[in-house]
Amino acid sequence: MARILLAEDDDNLRPFLARSLENAGHEVLAFSDGDEALPALHAAEFDILISDLVMPGMNGIELARHAREKAPDLPVIFITGFSAVAMEALNTVDGVSKVLSKPFHLNSLVEAVRNALEDRALS
């Protein structure tokens, strides 16, 4: 089981992702944007960050940078509807484990979480 910080501004997708990850055995704290997630990031330890790239206020790239300052080996998974933005994220943030383009299959996210956690355990 992993403790996951989820930041997603889509009010329909966020609870669906959180429930699905919880059903896969993970503990999920879900927030609507980076600004809302940042205090939780500083207050608690997480095993993985899953974040939308484009959100109001603090975007996913900025949130990931804050997360990596606190925990340099924290796996980061980005989800986005913009493939060009996804490529930019891969080039600007160290330690990105996966970028998933919306729409994606839930199994892809669960597998990305599992792979990121396994990679972290091996390093």
Predicted features along the sequence, with ranges:
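Receiver (REC) domain active-site loop signature in two-component systems and cognate sites
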Residues: M55
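Conserved acidic carboxylate
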Residues: E8
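Charged docking surfaces used in two-component/phosphorelay signaling
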Residues: P15-N23
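Alpha4 helix (beta4-alpha4-beta5 surface) of REC/receiver domains from two-component response regulators
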Residues: E62, F82-L100, N107, E111-R114
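Acidic catalytic/metal-coordinating carboxylates
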Residues: D33, N59-L63
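Active-site residues of response regulator receiver
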Residues: D52
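Short hydrophobic/Thr-rich beta-strand motif most characteristic of the beta2 strand and flanking loop
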Residues: G25-S32, A40
